[in-house]
Amino acid sequence: MLDNTGQVLRTIGKHGSGDGEFNFPTELRLRNGLLAVVDAMNFRVQIFDSGDRLVGKIGKMGDSSGQMYRPKGIAIDSEDHIYLVEGLWGVVQVFDREGQLLYTFGQRGTRLGDFQLPAGLFIDNSDGVYVVDSYNRRVQVFQYHGLRAQAEGAKP
């Protein structure tokens, strides 16, 4: 972290594979006091609170749901769900802040809702989910209705 003169105020982590350490961090998102960092070569996401304390980890290397091989884009929605683009499989995995897989969406392909080499992800203030679908040369937009919407009687 830098101040307005460019001086380093603090850093988070160091090289390694332990808790709070990184091996090729590639992306991060900050929302609702959570900092989620894609730790690509450790095949995980690490989650820190506003005091830079590690509060959660997501994933491990593998090819099953909840695992990752080429983690790419990351985002956090208004309910603190963490969305992770898995570039190799063409899916988006959604986790709670404790790292439990909630659901996935997408698959490898060219139809609407499919992805080929997804490379980025953004969630707007209305929980619109934007996925950069690089090989298909498009950005796909989805709307998450969430648990709050279910409680109010809306259909997810």
Predicted regions and their residues:
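Eukaryotic scaffold repeat domains enriched in small/polar residues
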Residues: 1-156
